[in-house]
Amino acid sequence: MKICKVIVASSQAVYGEGQYFCQEHGPFLPVPRSPQQLQRKLWELSCCKCDRVANPSLLAEQHTNPYNQYAVSKLAQEKTALGLGWIHGIPTVALRYSITQGPRQSLFNHYSGICRIFVSSALTGSPLVIYEDGLQTRDFVHIDDVVNANMLVLENDAAEGHAFNVGSGIRTSVVEYARLVRDKIGNQVEFRIPGEYRTGDNRHSVSSISKLKGLGWSPKKNLSDILDDFLNWIQQTGGIPHQIRDAYSHMKEAGVVLAAFD
């Protein structure tokens, strides 16, 4: 069987915290936040030279800096596929997806992300548990836009041999996300910020999408569309699993969710 093209499903996790910028010392790639830093509620990253709080840059394709086993495995998949594609003459592209959301996102996978967790919690009367201080930012992209990105690089020869970010390029804080969920559902949704954090979480993860835009792609749907489409799909499924508290308890028991000190 002749292989016409390979598209590798990668992740923005390959960037770790990505590149930061210090007003005095310029750009740098930070190390992960230490347990001691997180326990003291020092959520933001600091310059490695002067220890001043630094500003996150958009995640650009050239600044990979994976920390955990998932991120390392994704970057290894990319390099393996792109390298073998070059050697064997098989057109290959890697797509680094941001947090992909929308209809048919699993209602049962405890690790399927903020959309399922917040929406399911709100619809079942549970508070939305927000880690750290809620000001950490993420990049959310609609599944329809991800599909369109895959189709574009599948048909565009200029994409071959490259890695591309697929996201919205828009910073959304977790608190902003929670407020939008409350606005959409229309009931008295409660937030809870208990001063806890998840081990291994990045502080900010927002992708630059300029490279893929150069091929003619751009996202057509925003976060409001994501939640509308997800809520409409949930109504069609006819039920919400009552497993949110079990997932939260499981993560606490496993040492994934930890409490910071006041």
Language-model segments: what does each one mean?
Residues 13-15, 101, 170-172:
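Feature marks short, surface-exposed loop/turn motifs that line or immediately flank catalytic pockets
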Residues 75-82, 115-119, 148, 175:
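Conserved active-site helix of classical SDR/Rossmann-fold NAD(P)-dependent CH-OH oxidoreductases
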Residues 18-22, 105-109, 177-179, 204-205:
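Short aromatic-enriched loop/helix-cap "lid" or pocket-rim segments at secondary-structure transitions
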Residues 22-27, 110-113, 147, 182-183:
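Glycine-rich, phosphate-binding/catalytic loops in enzymes
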Residues 50-68, 92-107, 117-141, 165-167:
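A conserved pocket-lining segment of Rossmann-fold NAD(P)-dependent short-chain dehydrogenase/reductase
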Residues 1-98, 229, 236-237, 250-251, ...:
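N-terminal Rossmann-like NAD(P)+-binding domain of SDR-like oxidoreductases, especially those catalyzing
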Residues 122-262:
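C-terminal substrate-binding subdomain of Rossmann-fold SDR/epimerase-dehydratase oxidoreductases
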